[in-house]
């Protein structure tokens, strides 16, 4: 939790959802005793946050379709970017991230939290100690039930119900559409992240 770190100041936040802004302001005030500048009057207001001199880095935790665009804009503004998964949705967007980094020299990091789970780190430690010998084959995938995330009753996130899209709330409002309209593993780094590190 960044709010627990003494070397982190949260100077600004941005969200188009006023309820999320209120929750974030409350947590920041409780942890830091300060109120951050607030942005979110429209979908592109995040660019005004990126223009602030007292912002060194941003954490991007928006619906997926915004991840690449916001990360590219952050790097072009000279701000380090930590972007939630998935950082991109197309091969072209992957190259947008690479090319922007190479052009700007600004770093970004995909916040693939699975890599830091205790069980994954334990296996990585065993790999580094050569417990398994030479690894010649890996298999991975997205391995948990998401029905409670992708559907709800439109009143309570992560619960009962079958609503999604405009009738849903939280992630079911936007995330379920990806499964409906895309034939893809929309979270490939959950599986690939750990084995990529182990194969290195």
Predicted regions: what is each one?
Residues 1-83, 92-107:
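N-terminal glycine-/serine-/threonine-rich beta1-alpha1-beta2 phosphate-ribose binding loop
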Residues 84-86, 112:
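Short beta->alpha connector loops at strand-helix junctions that form conserved
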Residues 104-109, 114-200:
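Predominantly a Rossmann-like dinucleotide-binding segment in NAD(P)-dependent oxidoreductases
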Residues 17, 86, 141:
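Anionic group-transfer/hydrolysis microenvironments
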Residues 88-92, 118:
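Conserved PLP phosphate-binding loop immediately N-terminal to the Schiff-base lysine helix
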């Amino acid at each position: 939790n960044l709010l627990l770190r003494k070397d982190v100041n949260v100077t600004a936040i941005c969200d188009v959802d006023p309820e999320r802004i209120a929750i974030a302001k409350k947590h920041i005030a409780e942890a830091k005793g300060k109120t951050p500048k607030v942005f979110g009057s429209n979908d592109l207001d995040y660019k005004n946050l990126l223009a602030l001199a007292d912002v060194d880095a941003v954490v991007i935790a928006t619906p997926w379709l915004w991840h690449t665009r916001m990360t590219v804009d952050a790097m072009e503004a000279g701000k380090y970017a930590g972007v939630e998964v998935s950082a991109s949705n197309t091969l072209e967007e992957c190259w947008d991230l690479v090319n922007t980094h190479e052009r700007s020299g600004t770093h970004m990091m995909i916040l693939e939290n699975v890599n830091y789970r205790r069980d994954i780190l334990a296996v990585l430690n065993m790999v580094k100690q050569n417990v398994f010998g030479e690894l010649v084959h890996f298999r991975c995938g997205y391995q948990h039930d998401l029905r409670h995330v992708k559907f709800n009753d439109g009143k309570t996130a992560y619960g009962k119900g079958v609503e999604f899209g405009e009738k849903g709330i939280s992630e079911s409002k936007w995330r379920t559409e990806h499964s409906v309209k895309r034939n893809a593993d929309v979270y490939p780094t959950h599986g690939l992240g750990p084995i990529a590190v182990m194969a290195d």
